[in-house]
Amino acid sequence: MEQVTLTSDGTSSVFAENTVREVCNINYWGMRYYNVDEKGDIFVCPDPDKPQNRVSLAALAEKVQREQGAHLPTLFCFPQIIQHRLRSINQAFKRAREDFGYEGNYFLVYPIKVNQHRRIVESLISSGQPLGLEAGSKAELMAVLAHAGITQTVIVCNGYKDREYVRFALMGEKLGHKVYLVIEKLSEIQLVLEEAAKLNVKPRLGVRARLASQGSGKWQSSGGEKSKFGLSASQVLSLVQMLKEHECLDCLQLLHFHLGSQLGNIRDVATGVRESARFYVELHKLGVNIQCFDVGGGLGVDYEGNRTQSDCSVNYGLNEYADTVVWGIGQACREHGLPHPTIITESGRGVTAHHAVLVSNVIGVERYKFETLAAPAKDAPSVLHSMWETWVDIQSSREKRSLRSWIHESQFDLSDVHNQYNVGLLNLEQRAWAEQLYLNICHEVGQLFNEKHRSHRTIIDELQERFADKLYVNFSLFQSLPDAWGIDQLFPVCPISNLNQPVSRRAVLLDITCDSDGTIDHYIDGDGITTTMPMPHYEEDNPPLLGFFMVGAYQEILGNMHNLFGDTSTVDVLVHEQDKAYIVDYDEGNTVADMLEYVYLDPKKLLDRYREQIEHSNLPASEAIQFLNELEVGLNGYTYLEDE
């Protein structure tokens, strides 16, 4: 029988006969980029087509600390994963076009808002794969124009636009790029036509249609009729009429729509493609020669590894996604005898999510201790005797029908203890005794629950959460995993070693910010999500390093500087042989001085003020010099906790 037990040192353990590897689902969310070796260590294989080229994350963390003098937390980035993702997406659409006889081309356009860092864009451009770039603001467009280089590149310009934005885009067209200005609101068309006339250039226009269809999940509001962007059906007709009046209907060449980010259900994709294909058909009837069909983003990744349509998972694979898009558009074209347009996808998350993993150390562990207690004194308050009677009953009875009643009775008594303590009827020692006995009761009863009994599941979760180790991790949730805080997104998190060991402990992770929101609330646990993280056995004074996986999309860009914790150190790694990792780029994380300057505090002036205070103190000269030196070193140090 599969039991839910509490170990001898007091922590709850579900799936005790399963290994951490099995319950953390790395076989699924790892996508062959991450897996566990025979020693139980997580390794990274940046190119799954070359499985012999891999390296242990633990060894990599040790290497970067030894060779670069880096401190944890450190973000490890693998450009080869990005390039493999790009190839995989291109290959999936190539195969789908061949299977369905689709006559148009396919083009992946990377929306740089997902991660604008130089290393990402350069890795994509240097991959040798066909690639376009998408910008959603003036600043992004400036970056895209520079990265586009001297070769002809497809550039898609989304977002709201002013005159300068439009002019920069048209300049890109004159420089030889295919720049599509996607009309998000009708007022933009006048700006485009005016600036195009000034520059004597024919603009390439796109239109974003606001669909009735929308995806489900955390990002569903970015699609559908209530979407922030896009034109309604009547506005699309108005746009067509305006272009006819200006005799430039042939400028409208691209149809764009967006169902929402991280689409979990493939049926939502099929529904959206079907509706947007109707726009394509109707626009052709109006004389608009649409050449490009931009289905936007939405290609999801399986953060949970359970292959469902939940918010942080997907019930489809890359090939099924490509099949759905290609077949849906191709079917509409065949039915109406229309040309097959070039299909564009803006799959940023699907390209970048897997390439980055944050590795950090645990700087403190808090565990519940279970102690042997003596019976209360005869003259002790009755509530203490009541709790003791429950304890004695558990030791002698062991009747499973009493499991819940024992928990409930002890909870009621403990509440009574707190009330009596608050009014002075119990002293501190009596309160401490009662709280410890309550822990012992929960520990003892917890061994008798069976996880297979559905009726036990809720109380099992409560006990696991109550007795979980608290791991204080050297990172800022707000800086490194902002979506975990802001929208409760789940990311795969687990130790990077000993994953071949059975689950023997549970843990919750807390960051080092002075904010109670700085905790991770949900963790992968087999086919489900729980509020505690499965852990192998570890010594309290030697906790394992932890890996936060699939943080390559949005997290670096959205991260904020709560408590003035800055960017972590970043390492770009190439793997070309087994256990051979090459560090090709290392960027030190923000220093304390960097973060102070962000809030307009001049480190030099701060140092002058330290010096002034020290000079007016009564410190001995040697100590004064030491203090000033240490403060200066501190200004130039890492914002995260450093080893001695």
Swiss-Prot record:
GO terms for biological process: arginine catabolic process; putrescine biosynthetic process from arginine; spermidine biosynthetic process. The keyword Metal-binding applies. Its EC number is 4.1.1.19. Keywords: Decarboxylase, Lyase, Magnesium, Metal-binding, Polyamine biosynthesis, Pyridoxal phosphate, Spermidine biosynthesis. The keyword Cell division does not apply. It comes from the Bacteria. Substrate binds at F293, D294, V295, G296, G297, G298, L299, G300, V301, D302, Y303. Pfam families: Arg_decarb_HB (PF17810), Arg_decarbox_C (PF17944), Orn_Arg_deC_N (PF02784). One of its GO terms (molecular function) is arginine decarboxylase activity. The modification N6-(pyridoxal phosphate)lysine is found at K113. Transmembrane segments: none annotated. It is an enzyme of class 4 (lyase). It catalyses: L-arginine + H(+) = agmatine + CO2. Gene3D superfamilies: 1.10.287.3440, 1.20.58.930, Alanine racemase, Lyase, Ornithine Decarboxylase, Chain A, domain 1. Its cofactor is Mg(2+); pyridoxal 5'-phosphate. Catalyzes the biosynthesis of agmatine from arginine. PANTHER family: ARGININE DECARBOXYLASE, BIOSYNTHETIC ARGININE DECARBOXYLASE. Belongs to the Orn/Lys/Arg decarboxylase class-II family. SpeA subfamily. HAMAP family: SpeA (MF_01417). This is Biosynthetic arginine decarboxylase. The lineage of its organism: Bacteria, Pseudomonadati, Pseudomonadota, Gammaproteobacteria, Pasteurellales.
